[in-house]
């Protein structure tokens, strides 16, 4: 493939590239929350994920305003922080700083991995109804989000509108966040949601045509029948590449009874008059689609949810309705377990389960009917529900039996030991499966070199001829990923075979295979030459300097100084 370099060599450049399509039998999708880098998530950096186990990684979340202009939730985390170990050598605020850079670097080391941007989420869906309501704002948002992933070199867009037509008031304290936009839904959201997805699909296809690459579009969907009824699945599933059914949080501390929050099947022992949400399960979700749409949708695009985290209750009475599963469908006190995020949701990561069991005196239980794990203390009155390896294996088997598209989990930091992620992988592919790598094609940063002879050698200036075009903060930060010269290395060819040596600001200079090789990246200003910028240095030669003696200058780049070189381009003569 012309100008392609195998990623197994650990080389990468996210300027503009194309990826050959490689078939993998199922999707194994994982969210990564940008706040995972902070102490509240025990500094779970992207490099701590075992990316060899997943096919798609969703960055969560990007926001937008009512006009469809992009809004960063945390610019420092997204684009500026450099203290993550995988960002060694990257300057503050430079391209590939921040979580978005760290995720891109993670992809270098796992060339099969697709990385995407999730927009919205539970607390950032407030402007979706307004944006989706008009052609103008739909198109503006679509252009912006597609431009954003194009600049970053990412692979897909994920729309996480929670939820079309839903009306929910903002509740920052209840959600454990500073900003919760709520969702002012309208009945028209049903149609507008479909139109919004089509607008994004159109822009992705246009970008793909430019870059010779197929970009994916996914959606996160409610598994509640009431919310599912508000989606035109027969139309939506023709637009998107896959739909992630959020078959978790189906029950929780808001209820005055215990129930599974991510069951595969519905255990029918619940009180249908008082426990409405107890009917929800993966199978109930799929049955709804099958009953409503039959063969009018492609079920291989349906991805079902896994929860490596708990929902929990205190004050649980011994009046459970299933004698085979003590504590299930029992009266409980809502919002009674304080979680690490400050809410009363009883939410703890799977990696905290051992500590949780000890703290609350919990024993392991497994509901064979629901194929769901739970943890219960009948004496203390505590009940927690969460996926485990056994329930995940059952979900993987269900995916295969039903011809579905795979599994998705919220979120990586909650499975810090990769136990649930491994179970997901094993259930879909089996132990020992290796994802096939993919090839990338790179395009150049517009660049040139100017040369002047001096008494002992040459004054050389490397010019970045790109221009900054963006004013929106998110796009302005992302634009630098594509348009900057990073960790350059220069190969100077002379007609006379002159030997080159170091001069002012040249960094390391060697002579290899007839070239003078200049690596100035040890100098701060040479690590990143921004659009419109330049970097100047001098080199010495062992003969009389003459411009006519310089045959060519070839430039390569690196994302990190420690990574291999990519994309050789001749920048002199032009």
Model-identified regions with their sequence ranges:
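Glycan-recognition patch characteristic of GH18 chitinases/ENGases
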Residues: 21-149, 175, 339
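Conserved, mostly hydrophobic/aromatic
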Residues: 57, 117, 159, 200, ...
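Glycan-binding loop/region signatures in secreted carbohydrate-active enzymes
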Residues: 67-87, 119, 254, 260-272, ...
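Active-site cleft segment of glycoside hydrolase catalytic domains centered on the general acid/base Glu
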Residues: 127-237
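Short, solvent-exposed loop/turn segments enriched in Ser/Thr/Gly
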Residues: 452-459, 535
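Asparagine-centered strand-capping/turn motif at beta-strand->loop junctions
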Residues: 461-479, 492-494
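Intrinsically disordered, low-complexity Pro/Gly/Ser/Thr-rich segments with frequent PxxP/GP/PP motifs
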Residues: 502-545
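Terminal connector regions
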Residues: 533-574
